[in-house]
């Protein structure tokens, strides 16, 4: 990953948050109680990126059933569908909800946020530059 991303967008200038502090097994069980049908992906060293959008863009995103937010995680701990190996990084599609302080949902995956993380605003261009 480029150093500029590490220093800026993915650096440590956001609002500090704390995800679940349960064991991996326990946090997956807790998430499964709320979400029975979507695959779970547990991550560490995560950042919720709030997309900077206009009011019209926000209205369109919300009308489509989403929120203008994305998740980036430096480290995948466990992915039920094995799309990602432990230790891989991941950037989500647009989020639908962020609940309980550790559950970030998209239309196709429930991301379980473990340990410390952060939340910060970012441009759509910056978010999609993460690849």
Predicted regions and their residues:
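N-terminal non-globular leader segments, chiefly Sec-dependent signal peptides
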Residues: 1-98, 116-131
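Amphipathic alpha-helical packing elements
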Residues: 101-115
